[in-house]
Regions:
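Active-site neighborhood of HAD-like aspartate-dependent phosphohydrolases
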Residues: 1-58
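Metal-dependent phosphoesterase signature
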Residues: 50-83, 91
Length: 157
């Protein structure tokens, strides 16, 4: 891997996008009372983020994905994002997006910007079976995507 003098690691949900696509997509198919209950458990430390997201998605039918993608299509990208990417390219600073959300969501939203993004790391959502399955090689039991582990893959000063 290349040694970078400077590198930008950017979060996706709520940083590049104007809202969190994970939370929004969960709300599409989950009982609002259940969402509140599990959000409370997360806030009280009774469940980890990894557990809550797995619970929500792995109980959902794979057939829900098209509806989720329709929702993702409606989520905005923050103003100035393209200009930021263009400036980083001029300065020869690579931009790596690390998303704790689903690859299908981030890849879809970032498609118009791919030429400026060095790499996208995201959680995989397997929809090949009747139920969704969350796959992440960087799940540490607390987070689905332990971003510091991904950052450690890159050599930078």
């Amino acid at each position: 891997m290349d040694l970078y003098k400077t590198i930008i690691f950017a979060d996706f949900d709520g940083t590049i996008t104007t809202e969190d696509t994970i939370v929004g997509s969960i709300r599409l198919f989950s009982d609002p009372k259940e969402v509140e209950e599990y959000n409370g458990k997360l806030e009280r430390g009774e469940m980890t983020l990894s557990q809550v997201v797995r619970y929500a998605f792995e109980d959902a039918p794979s057939s829900y994905l098209p509806r989720m993608l329709e929702y993702v299509d409606q989520v905005g990208i923050r103003p100035g994002f393209q200009e930021f990417l263009e400036e980083m390219q001029k300065l020869q600073i690579p931009v790596v997006v690390i998303s704790g959300g689903m690859r299908q969501f981030s890849q879809r939203k970032l498609e118009p910007y791919r030429k400026w993004i060095t790499k996208l790391h995201a959680v995989e959502l397997d929809v090949s079976g009747p139920k969704m399955k969350v796959i992440s090689p960087y799940d540490d039991g607390n987070e689905l995507m332990k971003k510091t582990d991904v950052m450690a893959l890159y050599d930078y000063e």
